[in-house]
Amino acid sequence: MSEPNTPLHAQPNEQLDLNNLNDLDEKDIDDLNLDPNSDVEISADSGDVVNSNIDNVIWQRNCNKKRRYHTPEFNDVYNETNNTINDVTMLDDVDDFQPRINVSSPFSSATKLSELLPNDHNGTSHPRRLSMSQQSKFISYVDDQLLQIQRKFVQSRGLNIKNGYASLTPLLQDLKTLVDFVWYSIAHVPNSDYLLQSEEKRHCPDSRNPKDTCGYSSYFGQGSYLIKIADDLIDYVEKFTFKNMEDSEINDTLSKLFKLFFILDRIFVILTDDNDNCKEVPKTSSASKNIAGLNGTDIVRLKGIAERTRVRLPIFLESQGIHGYHYELSKIYEGFLDHANSF
């Protein structure tokens, strides 16, 4: 096979005449065949052969992809098409974008949401701020609980499996209990499950008059603990596996996981709203000294955590062979990010 000549190129200032172009002769076409021993014969009509090969490769890749994402019943219907591309098979399952969990249900099935609604502190006084001694005890207790959770998590990685977390569910329950404790110190509500309800069905601190909320504050920086929990949560989740679990167990675990994300999101929205609502209070007012909520540094730090979680969690679920839950994934920290980006 002779080496083809280098084609002539137009000069820098030369205008090409696109209507006067020479076609390739048979010798040039033969020179294009880099594998003369191949059974594929390149000719002037070789475009049909190339397109056919490309279509076969694309079809095979799509076929393998669909077998991974769909049920056996779907694959049977898919194979009966005799390699005829159907518009339905080229689309994602509609069910993957529908809610998989009942967001309004409590984190624990034994909890009754009707018993968790705030009682407006009996309609008398605002939540009492903790004294310095109480704040010190609070900090010591939360630090100890975070350390206990971290220690049990490390033990479950192989050091002492019996004393560690056997699965992700008990870890989520411990984190949820700690979130409830921290939230109680802020809102004086014993269980944060009521935040899963719609705005119309709950009465929480952020629904009060901003002028009323700015006059007092039981917040002394507890948000930093909630931010740490949110930061550690995705790191904990990625160390567990779902591959040997039943479908019902997977759904139950993911239900608790998403609800914990939604509760944290709602709390962060409330703490962010408190800062925003209190802007109405004059700076000379004594109430402005007791504004409750996340500061600018907390918000910037939390934005990075929220965006990182929204990226890493779908990747982790896909690595575990779990598909769907697109609706729940799209709602993770959605409320907080909307508020934070509006500043």
From Swiss-Prot:
The gene is TFB6. This is General transcription and DNA repair factor IIH subunit TFB6. Present with 3510 molecules/cell in log phase SD medium. Keywords: Cytoplasm, Nucleus, Phosphoprotein, Transcription, Transcription regulation. The modification Phosphoserine is found at S104, S105, S108, S342. It comes from Saccharomyces cerevisiae (strain ATCC 204508 / S288c). One of its GO terms (biological process) is nucleotide-excision repair. Component of the general transcription factor TFIIH, composed of a 7-subunit TFIIH core complex composed of XPB/SSL2, XPD/RAD3, SSL1, TFB1, TFB2, TFB4 and TFB5 which is active in NER; the 3-subunit CTD-kinase module TFIIK composed of CCL1, KIN28, and TFB3 which is active in transcription; as well as TFB6 that regulates SSL2 association with the complex. GO terms for cellular component: cytoplasm; nucleus; transcription factor TFIIH holo complex. It comes from the Eukaryota. The modification Phosphothreonine is found at T71, T84.
